């Protein structure tokens, strides 16, 4: 393991440098920089801790082998330590493997109703609530940037910004990046008088929001900016002035809305940040053709034929069609209990990456 050891030497030095930097009050006068350093330190701390455990286990194994040469009672202990060393070695190798560069990032998530009329809008609202509950379970913050509601209180569309708190090694993107695509629901709609099960669909688009948006140039002449009076669920006013902002990026057709900041200027600034993140994601997809299918085609059309997951109410079943995952706890899933599903998706993604490498 010569190469990983060399890598570890570099990471140990970086870990020590960050530890000193984070102890300096001067750094914390720059909150964004301190947060970025804290996240990096948290990830390195896991690697360093595993490496130190591996070093200690190897030393114990060497001692056990020496003792076993003259005392058979140490043979079993040596075997246990060999298994421990192999386990830690595997963990460290996994930690040192190339990672998605956005794993520590926050996200912007869009939910859009599709076919199914009012029922689709109600299902889109169920999905938005599911993600909000999941974020709450993890102590993350959720901001509703914009929403268009239906007559029965569903979502025609909604845009959420989800951000982790504190210094975490893995951010929101690492857990929620597989949610983009078409979600299908099978249930009896509230508008159905005959008790028949209907199928509807809603689409989800999710993309990372890096702390620093790269070299994305946005020409003001490519933008159409509209100002309007926003309204939230149930028609209640969110703003007392026409402060909501809708920005359309004409070359791509991307539309970003923001209505929940305190002023029109703040809404425009936030909408531009989201637009920049969206355009950066598109640029990265084009630069990485092999990976582009993962996100670029998340919502080509919100149609039942392009589904990633089905929520079947009569059978209390959730099925993720990409990995064949099934569970019969639909009510818990819709209440934000998504970790088992997300773990399965991450494991499948990891296996696919290993097969491609």
Swiss-Prot record:
Keywords linked to the UniProt accession: Cytoplasm, Methylation, Protein biosynthesis
Alphabetized Pfam families for the sequence: PCRF, RF-1
GO molecular-function term, one example from the UniProt record: translation release factor activity, codon specific
Cellular compartment(s): Cytoplasm
UniProt-recorded name of the protein: Peptide chain release factor 1
Main localisation: cytoplasm
Physiological role: Peptide chain release factor 1 directs the termination of translation in response to the peptide chain termination codons UAG and UAA.
PTM comment text: Methylated by PrmC. Methylation increases the termination efficiency of RF1.
Family, as annotated: Belongs to the prokaryotic/mitochondrial release factor family.
Entries under InterPro entries matching the protein: PCRF, Pep_chain_release_fac_I, Pep_chain_release_fac_I_sf, Prokaryotic/Mito_RF, RF-1
Superkingdom of the organism of origin: Bacteria
Residues recorded as bearing N5-methylglutamine in the entry: 236
Cellular compartments per GO CC: cytoplasm
